[in-house]
Amino acid sequence: MQCFRPKIIGLTTANGNTNENNVYRNNQRILKVAKRQDVPIYRGSKSSLVTTPETTDYFGRDGLGDVDEELTDLVPAKDQGAVSALVELSKTYEGQLTVITLGALTNIAMAIKTDPNFLSRLSHLYVGAGHIHMFVTKLLRNGLTNSFEILCVYSVGQRIGRKLFFIPLSDKDSLP
């Protein structure tokens, strides 16, 4: 029996429930705590493609519960941006790369726009984006705030078969 051993080859950032600068700092915090500062961070979109929603303090001013910790010994982000990194990694790991989104889909939508074959080279794309509004059943929060991006990913994803998965945790009955 073969064991699934995922390898994290990068993180990308985008404006979402907090601004992109906070997302970048929060990724740094998480990687430092996890002792995984070997994982590169590729900075991405600072705004949505059409309408950038206002960020709220729902998860604190920093988007991660207002962790008032001095950040030291951080690894700088890669010079390469998120969109070009996603496209390049999809070519390097063609048929093997699984992308998991935890926020706005702007970088994914831009990767599709940059390279229409981007999604077809992925093994899978899991969209688990910002499920914070429990009253919105079966809709992703970022589907409401980044509707153009989610429509772009969904419409292209329909053509590539069983590689695209939306994880609708916003349905309160589906939570453990």
Descriptions of predicted regions:
Residues M1-P176:
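N-terminal acidic, glycine/proline-rich low-complexity segments
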